[in-house]
Every structure is written in C-alpha cells, then in structure tokens.
C-alpha cells in the first residue's frame, strides 16, 4: 500500500499503540489530543508516560492540539476517544474536515444517552460526502502488548467491504493482522458488551472464586451478549470470532484489562469512585452496563449477568449476593441457536 496520512483522534493507550503500528507500516501519523502536557511530551520526549512508562515512540509520530492540522490532507481518520465524547468530537471533525476520508473507530462502548453504537453516531454527525462507510476496528487487543509488537489479530468491519479491506491493508504487518467482516452490529456490540462480562469475571476473582466460576461467567456471558446482539440484528456467528469470543477471553481473563481490574476491586469491596480515581483511565464497562441493562429491559432480552452487575453498581446490591443469586435462576437449555 502507498504511504497514507492518518489522523488518530485520541492519544490514549490504544490510540498510541495503533499510531506505532501505522508508523511501522510507513504511514504518516498525526495524533490529536487536548492535553497540552501530553502533546508536548509526545513531540519532544517521544513518550506517552501516563500509559507507557518505558516505551519510546518513533520520532516520526507527531502530535497536535490543532484538529485542523491533524486532519489536513488525511487519507484516513481513526477515532479512539471515550464513548461519551465521540459525538462531540465527530461534530468538531465535521466542521473542520474539507475533503473525503476513510473514517474508522477503535472504541468500544454504547452512547449512554441514546444507546447508539459508535458507527451510527459517526454516520449521523459526519456528512456522507466527507467519509467512507464507517469501519470498526475491534478485537482481542491489549495496548500494552501491541505497543511492544506482540502478535495481535483483530477485525475490520464495515458495511462496505472495500473500506474494510482498505483498513485491513493499512494496518496489517508481521505482528498485527486484521480480518474483514461486514457484520458491523455484531462486531460493535461484541466489543462493547464484553466489557460488562469482564467486570463480572474480575468481580469473581476479587471475591475469591476459582477458574470454574470465571469460565462459567465468560461462557454464559457470551450467550447473553449474543442474545442481545441477535435481537439488534447481528449474525450469531460473529460472536464466535475475534471480536466476540476472542475479545471476551482477552478482556475477561487478564490483569491488563481495566474492566477486569475494576471488577476485581469491586469484588474486594472497594468503592466505584475510588476505583475510577485510582485507575486514571476510562472504564467503559461501567457505563455500558447501564446502557445494556436498559436495552435488555426495553427489548425483553434475558441478560442475568448484566442485570447482576447493574444492580451491584447502580442499585447498591451486594455483588456477591447478586452473583450467587444467578445460581437459583430458572433452568435453561445451553444452546439457543439450533435451527
């Protein structure tokens, strides 16, 4: 692929790791953020120490506070900002962007106020004449591993397979590989909802339960993620792929996962406000729990794990009692997808 200019909106851990992947592939990368000290550190010291204490970035990776500068002549734009500000940033992009570009996002969540997926927000806020069909970049990926060039395989999903293949070629190299998918609903709901299950798996660890219990929550968590996704129009097969079970495994079993760590802290009895303060990073699974619970209630979808986490976080229920309460739920068949 010829050299591309890529604007990455959001110099957090994942945005920074993806900037390095693109730089390794010979592309021109511009990171945009709104914290002057961070932008200055990236440009002068070539580090992003809030997220990676011992990583030195290539000097070719540039950062800016100026959105217009970041977007100038960009062939592709990658949103990697927290879910709650995606719409705001998309509005800003729409005001500044003066040419058509491939628009991607690599965030995982659902908008709290509208319950919308992030690709829908980008479609609504960025005029069609200024963008491709949205491409979702999602899958099992810890930034801490990608930044040291550990092997990572994820998904590029779009309603337009040509756009998905462009992103596949843009990112793929000897340690980072993308597979294409056209099931945007499935890929986005998998990426968002697995954070809830990761909180639950972490909570079990914090409560002192063993691998049997964690495996149960992850597996039955996948079942309820699939249940809701299919209700929203997704292909159930998507949840057996990288963006589904793959992401659930990596997020639901690892100390790298901020959602798992938050759940573990909740299981130990720590207060949510203290957990969020100590972590210093967005815990998407907390807000997504509320959104998913509300959608499930509205659509009549059975999501017992999500309900248990919701009641613990938002209604003050004891997390151990909430989880153990699921053991007395009605008996059900395991496989819901027989034809």
From Swiss-Prot:
Task: Report the principal subcellular site.
Answer: cytoplasm
- BP GO terms, sorted: carbohydrate metabolic process; glycerol-3-phosphate biosynthetic process; glycerol-3-phosphate catabolic process; glycerophospholipid metabolic process; phospholipid biosynthetic process
A single MF term (Gene Ontology): NAD binding
- Sequence positions that bind NADPH: 13-14, 108, 143, 258, 282, 284
Indicate the residues that form the catalytic site.
Answer: 194
Subcellular location(s) of the protein: Cytoplasm
| GO CC entries | cytosol
The alphabetical list of record keywords is: Cytoplasm, Lipid biosynthesis, Lipid metabolism, NAD, NADP, Nucleotide-binding, Oxidoreductase, Phospholipid biosynthesis, Phospholipid metabolism
Q: Which Pfam families match?
A: NAD_Gly3P_dh_C, NAD_Gly3P_dh_N
Q: Which domain of life is it from?
A: Bacteria
Q: In which pathway does it act?
A: Membrane lipid metabolism; glycerophospholipid metabolism
- Which residues are noted in the entry as sn-glycerol 3-phosphate-binding? 108, 139, 141, 194, 247, 257-259
Documented EC number(s): 1.1.1.94
Question: What functional role does this protein have?
Answer: Catalyzes the reduction of the glycolytic intermediate dihydroxyacetone phosphate (DHAP) to sn-glycerol 3-phosphate (G3P), the key precursor for phospholipid synthesis.
Q: What's the protein here called?
A: Glycerol-3-phosphate dehydrogenase [NAD(P)+]
């Amino acid at each position: 692929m010829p050299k591309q200019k890529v604007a990455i909106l959001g110099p957090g851990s994942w945005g920074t790791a993806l900037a390095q992947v693109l730089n390794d592939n010979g592309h021109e990368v511009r990171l945009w953020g709104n914290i002057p000290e961070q932008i200055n550190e990236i440009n002068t010291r070539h580090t992003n120490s809030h997220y990676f204490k011992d990583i030195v970035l290539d000097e070719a990776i540039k950062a800016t506070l100026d959105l217009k500068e970041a977007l100038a002549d960009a062939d592709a734009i990658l949103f990697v900002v927290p879910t709650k500000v995606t719409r705001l940033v998309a509005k800003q992009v729409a005001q500044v962007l003066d040419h058509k570009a491939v628009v991607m996002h690599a965030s995982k969540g659902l908008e709290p106020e509208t319950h919308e997926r992030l690709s829908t927000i980008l479609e609504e806020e960025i005029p069609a004449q200024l963008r491709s069909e949205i491409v979702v970049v999602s899958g099992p990926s810890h930034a801490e591993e990608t930044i040291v060039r550990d092997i990572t395989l994820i998904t590029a999903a779009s309603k337009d397979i040509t756009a998905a293949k462009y992103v596949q070629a843009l990112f793929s190299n000897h340690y980072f590989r993308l597979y294409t998918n056209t099931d945007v609903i499935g890929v986005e709901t998998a990426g968002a909802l697995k954070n809830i299950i990761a909180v639950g798996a972490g909570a079990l660890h914090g409560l002192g339960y063993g691998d049997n219990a964690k495996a149960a929550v992850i597996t039955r968590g996948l079942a309820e993620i699939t249940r809701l996704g299919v209700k929203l129009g997704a292909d159930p097969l998507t949840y057996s792929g990288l963006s589904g079970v793959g992401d659930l495994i990596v997020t639901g079993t690892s100390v790298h996962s901020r959602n798992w760590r938050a759940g573990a802290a909740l299981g130990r009895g720590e207060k949510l406000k203290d957990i969020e303060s100590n972590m210093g990073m967005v815990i998407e699974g907390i807000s997504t729990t509320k959104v998913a619970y509300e959608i499930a209630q509205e659509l009549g979808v059975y999501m017992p794990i999500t309900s248990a986490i919701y009641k613990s976080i938002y209604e003050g229920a004891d997390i151990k009692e909430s989880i153990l309460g699921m053991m007395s739920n009605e008996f059900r068949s395991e496989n819901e997808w027989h034809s």
